[in-house]
A protein has these predicted regions:
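Expand to "…catalyze enediolate/carbanion chemistry for C-C bond making/breaking, isomerization
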Residues: 1-288
C-alpha cells in the first residue's frame, strides 16, 4: 500500500484548469491534494486553451506543491480525451504533476492506456460515477498505477436515476462496494464525493461523518471550495480519545514485549495494534 502524501491525504480540492491564478491559491489552502479540472469546470470552447496553459502555470509552482497536483482529464470517448491524455503524459514526464484523475471510469483498459502514456511514475485515480463503473470496480482498483478509488456521488445518482435525500442512504451499498474493492486491491482508503453546497457547513459535517474511516471506510473527501478543506481534514482525523487509546495500546504492547496483552479488560492482539498504529499514522499527516 502506498504511503505517499496523496495516499494519506484527507482532502482533494478541485480548481478549474482555465483559472491559473487559482492553482497556487489552491495549494496554499491546506488541502492534501489539488485536482486541476479539465472536465466539468471548463467549457468546451475553452478546453484546448486551458490544456495548453497548464505547463506554464505548473512550472511556476513550488516543486513540493507539484507533488500534490492531479489533473482531471475528460472521459474516455469524449472529443478531448486523447489530447488530454497526451498533455498529462507530458506533464508527468516533466515532473509537473503527480498523476491523473479519470472521470466516468468504467473500463480497466482505459486506465491501462493512461498508465502506459504517463509512465510508471504517474499515479491514477479512477472516479466511479456510473453503474458500469461500479460493475467494473474490482478491475479498476486492480489496474496499474491506481493510487486510490474516488466516488462521484452526484454523477452516480444521475446515471442510475436516483434522487437521494441529504443522507444519501441509497448510496450506502455503493460506498461499501468501493470500500471492499479498495481492500481487495490493497489500496489506501477511498475518496468520498462532494458536498455541493459549500456554504452549508452543517451538511458538510454530516457528509464527512458518514464517510469517516471508522464508519464508512472512506479516508478522504473531494472538496469544491477552500472553506471545506479544514473542517473535512479535522473530521476525517482521529479524535483526542482515539489517539489517547492508540498510544496506550502501543505502550502496553511494548511493555509486554509483543504478543497478546489485556488493556481495560479487553484483549489487545495484532489487529488491535494495527488499528492503533493506523490512528497514529493518520494523526501524523498534517494539512499541507
Amino acid at each position: 500500500m502506498s504511503t505517499t502524501p496523496l495516499a494519506l491525504a484527507r482532502t482533494f480540492l478541485f480548481v478549474p484548469a482555465d483559472r491559473p491564478e487559482r492553482h497556487a491559491r489552491a495549494l496554499a489552502a491546506g488541502t492534501g491534494g489539488v485536482i486541476v479540472d479539465l472536465e466539468d469546470a471548463v467549457a468546451p470552447e475553452r478546453k484546448a486553451s486551458a490544456r495548453e496553459g497548464l505547463v506554464a502555470s505548473f512550472a511556476a509552482l513550488p516543486e513540493a506543491g507539484r507533488q500534490r497536483l492531479l489533473v482531471r482529464i475528460n472521459a474516455s470517448g469524449t472529443p478531448w480525451h486523447d489530447d488530454d491524455r497526451a498533455a498529462v503524459a507530458a506533464l508527468v514526464g516533466q515532473g509537473l504533476i503527480a498523476g491523473v484523475v479519470l472521470p466516468k471510469a468504467e473500463r480497466a483498459g482505459d486506465l491501462q492506456r493512461l498508465a502506459e502514456a504517463i509512465g510508471p511514475q504517474g499515479q491514477l485515480v479512477p472516479l466511479i460515477e456510473s453503474a458500469a463503473g461500479l460493475a467494473a470496480v474490482d478491475e479498476l482498483a486492480a489496474a496499474p498505477q491506481v493510487l486510490r478509488l474516488a466516488f462521484g456521488n452526484l454523477d452516480f445518482q444521475a446515471d442510475v436515476g436516483l434522487a437521494c435525500d441529504a443522507d444519501e442512504a441509497e448510496l450506502v451499498p455503493v460506498r461499501l462496494a468501493l470500500l471492499l474493492a479498495t481492500r481487495r486491491a490493497g489500496l489506501p482508503a477511498p475518496i468520498d464525493g462532494v458536498t455541493a453546497d459549500w456554504r452549508d457547513l452543517q451538511r458538510l459535517a454530516a457528509d464527512t461523518a458518514r464517510a469517516r474511516a471508522r464508519r464508512g471506510g472512506f479516508g478522504a473527501k473531494l472538496c469544491i471550495h477552500p472553506d471545506q478543506v479544514a473542517p473535512v481534514h479535522a473530521a476525517l482525523g482521529p479524535s483526542a480519545d482515539e489517539l489517547a487509546w492508540a498510544r496506550r495500546v502501543i505502550d502496553a504492547i511494548r511493555s509486554a514485549g509483543g504478543g497478546v496483552v489485556s488493556l481495560d479488560g479487553r484483549m489487545v492482539d495484532a489487529p488491535v495494534v494495527r488499528l492503533a498504529e493506523r490512528l497514529l499514522a493518520l494523526d501524523a499527516q498534517p494539512p499541507s
